[in-house]
């Protein structure tokens, strides 16, 4: 087995951290993290130098920061019910979510520039199309139970359910990984042949719907307790919030 070392790369000093949430790397390798309780974004260089990211816009409980392939920054501005896009030149675009019951917890941007958004209270996955139109990808809008939990059918998400989510991330081949915080599962959403996620296929890949625990092993019998953030690289990494653990999901070959 591999051995790992843990070290602190950024800590309070010239800046103050208070409930740092999710972050992302820009194209030059600088890390930006949503500093939720202080309503700002912290910039962390590769040397560990921290500063408050300066912008003309203001935030209210920012939850997540991510970047697209062109270097544009996206911020989940939860309590303002908006996603903010900030270009390298400082231009800010506001993607409004005020029509929904809850603001954004997490985001992921695909290769076409569509912004996928997870929330804690709509019980749906949302998407801003390239023209800025807000759409529902799937979810009935009702909090699921173990009895009503459903992935829907292949290329038919009309009956698919979704709990709260704090983590979505794209993996290889534009498959979207989703943590279902309410139902303690990890799911994937694969688009149809035309790249349409609203007609895609949803699949639970890990966890037992509605069952809390911290059992490792075969993914569909393993258990989580409120899985939050997800990161996809060579493995799938899960922040298992209430178990206070970092978990990995690997594919058996």
Language model region names:
Residues 2-21, 48-63, 89-105, 133-166, ...:
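Gly/Pro-rich loop segments of beta-rich domains
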Residues 5, 39-43, 81-85, 123-127, ...:
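A short loop-to-beta-strand structural motif that recurs across blades of beta-propeller domains
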Residues 25-28, 67-70, 109-112, 170-173, ...:
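Residue-level detector of Asp-centered blade-edge/turn motifs that repeat once per structural unit
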Residues 30-33, 72-75, 114-117, 175-178, ...:
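Conserved beta-propeller blade signature
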Residues 36, 78-79, 120-121, 181, ...:
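Short loop/turn segments immediately following the C-termini of beta-strands
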Residues 189-197, 249-253:
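Short loop/turn segments immediately following beta-strands, especially the blade-tip
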């Amino acid at each position: 087995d591999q051995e790992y070392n843990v070290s602190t790369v950024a800590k309070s000093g010239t800046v103050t951290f208070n409930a740092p949430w999710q972050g992302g790397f820009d194209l030059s390798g600088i890390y930006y993290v949503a500093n939720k309780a202080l309503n700002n974004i912290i910039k962390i260089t590769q040397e560990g130098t921290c500063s408050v990211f300066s912008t003309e816009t203001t935030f209210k409980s920012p939850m997540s920061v991510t970047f697209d392939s062109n270097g544009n920054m996206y911020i989940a501005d939860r309590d303002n019910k908006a996603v903010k896009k900030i270009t390298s030149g400082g231009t800010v675009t506001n993607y409004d979510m005020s029509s929904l019951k809850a603001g954004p917890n997490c985001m992921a941007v695909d290769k076409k520039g569509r912004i996928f958004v997870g929330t804690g209270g709509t019980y749906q996955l949302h998407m801003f199309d390239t023209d800025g139109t807000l759409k529902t990808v799937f979810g009935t809008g009702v909090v699921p139970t173990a009895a009503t939990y459903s992935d829907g059918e292949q290329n038919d998400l009309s009956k698919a359910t979704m709990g709260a989510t704090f983590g979505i991330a794209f993996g290889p081949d534009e498959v979207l990984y989703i943590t279902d915080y309410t139902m303690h599962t990890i799911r994937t959403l694969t688009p149809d042949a035309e790249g349409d996620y609203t007609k895609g296929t949803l699949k639970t890949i890990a966890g037992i719907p509605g069952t809390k625990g911290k059992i490792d092993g075969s993914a569909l019998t393993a258990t989580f307790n409120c899985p939050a953030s997800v990161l996809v690289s060579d493995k799938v990494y899960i922040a298992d919030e209430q178990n206070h653990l970092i978990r990995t999901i690997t594919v058996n070959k």
